Amino acid sequence: MGSVVYEGKEELVAWASQVIGFDPRPDVVAIGWSDGQKLRAVTLYDGFSQCDCNMHIASDGTGFWLRRPFLLASFAHPFVQWDLRRVTGLVPAKNTAALRFDLHLGFQREGLIRHALPDDDIIVLGLLREECRYIPQQYRR
């Protein structure tokens, strides 16, 4: 089974930072997914504006974390709890697995930031609240 983890922000951010090389901003918020014994995934949010935030998902690579309750919690935070209109994903162009995963979640390709990384470009992805299939219909306005 498993459960969403809301406590222990520092531990969650540190775990995700190790997995995906994330450099946390001061405004970072984190939730995790645990199988009861081990942390399996973390969703990070940062770069908040009135309508948007950046969203980053880190996992242990096993697939044990990819559960509907975790995806619901991950998308309910920005769209239901914070009432944001969209989330943004910033994916290194070379990270084809992450890009494929994000597109499968429903993100749309919106642009390219050339030479944004020392050895790569960044692909900009966006997901609008009304496009998010993981939150209940009444919140997709």
Regions of interest found by a model, annotated:
Residues 6-52, 62:
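Acetyl-CoA-dependent GNAT
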Residues 46-57, 83-85, 118-121:
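A conserved beta-turn-beta hairpin within the catalytic core of GNAT-like acetyltransferases
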Residues 56-66, 92:
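A short, internal acetyl-CoA/4′-phosphopantetheine-binding micro-motif in the GNAT/acyltransferase core
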Residues 66-74:
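Conserved acetyl-CoA pyrophosphate-binding loop and the N-cap/start of the following alpha-helix
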Residues 80-91:
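Conserved GNAT acetyl-CoA-binding A-motif
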Residues 90, 108-123:
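Conserved catalytic-core motifs of GNAT/GCN5-like acyltransferases
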Residues 94-111:
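Conserved active-site alpha-helix within GNAT-family acetyltransferase domains
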Residues 116-141:
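C-terminal "cap" of GNAT-fold acetyltransferases
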